[in-house]
Amino acid sequence: MEFFAWLDQLDKNIFTAIQEQLGVEWLDSAMLLLRNATTWIPLYLFVLIWIFKNASPHAVSFIVLTIITFAFCDFVSASVLKPLVGRLRPCYDTDVASSVRGLIGCGGRFSFPSSHAANHFGLATFWFLAIRHVIGK
């Protein structure tokens, strides 16, 4: 079996095992909360307020660069990597669709990489580097 076919089958086996044997209701609720964009508003507001308070001459640049970082990460993950990798979301993959515990709608056709993860990782990296520069460490 070719490596990528083996990896695809392993991915499907792990997904099916998690969906059918390891589903936990309280964890479902926690994950739904964490994936909700409004959950993160307090963090974003805190960072913005902190920047205006501690780095006011650079605050506008910080906000503009934050928006650029978000847009870049979202574009690369959704428009470049997802079509390039072509990993179907489980709800569209006939091999595992019957195992999907549909807690939310299905979304776009492809699922890898996660745009949520790419966007948050991009923001976290930019903020870490920028804030470190602002506080001089």
What are these regions (language model features)?
Residues 33, 71-74, 113, 117:
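Hydrophobic transmembrane-helix microenvironments that flank and shape a buried ionizable site
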Residues 43-53, 122-128:
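Hydrophobic, aromatic-rich transmembrane alpha-helices
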Residues 48-77:
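Interfacial segments of alpha-helical transmembrane regions
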Residues 53-55, 72, 86-92, 119:
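Short alpha-helical linear motifs
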Residues 26, 56-62, 132-137:
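Membrane-helix interface segments
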Residues 1-43, 77-108:
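N-terminal transmembrane-helix/juxtamembrane module of multi-pass inner/ER membrane proteins
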Residues 67, 71, 79-83, 122, ...:
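Generic beta-strand or strand-like secondary-structure segments
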